[in-house]
Amino acid sequence: MFIVDSYALAVVFCFVTMLCWGSWGNTQKMAAKTWRYELFYWDYVIGMFLFALILSLTMGSFGSEGRPFLQDLGQASGANIASALLGGVIFNASNILLSASTALAGMAVAFPLGVGLALVLGVIINYAGAPKGDPVILFVGVALIVAAIVCNGIASGRMQKGAGGNSNSRKGIVLAMVAGVLMSFFYRFVAAAMDLDHFENLTAGMLTPYSALFILSAGVLLSNFVFNTYVMKRPFVGAPVSYREYFTGSGTTHLVGMLGGAVWCLGTAFSYIAAGKAGAAISYALGQGAPMVAAVWGVFVWKEFRGAGRSVGWLLAVMFLFFILGLACIILSGGN
């Protein structure tokens, strides 16, 4: 299997993760004009599962180091498979809420609040499980991310006040916060199933990053029959959606959703592959710089803060500054 052999390359992989995790939401925005997010989400999950399988059979199967994908699956212990599956179930619950929040409140609000909160809690959880890097610099970086989240929250609040507010936006903010709390836990369950210290000569019973990703995506797909079916019948906003409507979508519409799942899956694969050199906490934290990427898309491409006053513009500028400084601290923490 392919293995990252240097911290510098691990950081590059983490930046790719950040771009992927912060950009997949664009596919939802592209499909949202004619396609309910509950239907989009099925394509997203299918794309994620298929791309995880492709990565596992290619990058996860070639090379002289580590264990190839199929051999690794055959020797994995039940406890580690269950841990990765549980990570997929937790992620799916959080991501459905995040997708709903994006549909209600926009990318520039949902991602910084939801994923930013997941970053803070997730770094603490992952560092406690596998300490690596300078904790002082790491948590200074996390504190700066918290400051960025606060700026985003104030900016979105002023936007609502200026526009008279609406119940959908408020509901979207609440959903983003709940999603963030749930999302902070999924990575640890998957990381616990992997041998992060010995990718070249893995411990028996533990998983490679590729096998862990495949099992995670299987957990997402299986749990989607429960979670998304429930949301389709009892949506957060709008009328209930039927499975019959899913099959009325065009091929292009379905492919856009699958692309979103593939983009997220690529980012997650790179995060797990990088964790061997960077450590779970740092790999997770760098990837969760995604809110800044999503906010850039939301502010500059989708114009979600169009018409905002000068004070909102300053808050957004400070938010971006704090995110950049926070990410810099997280990178530095791994070199100490």
Give the role of each language-model region.
Residues 1-336:
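Polytopic alpha-helical membrane proteins, predominantly small-molecule transporters/carriers
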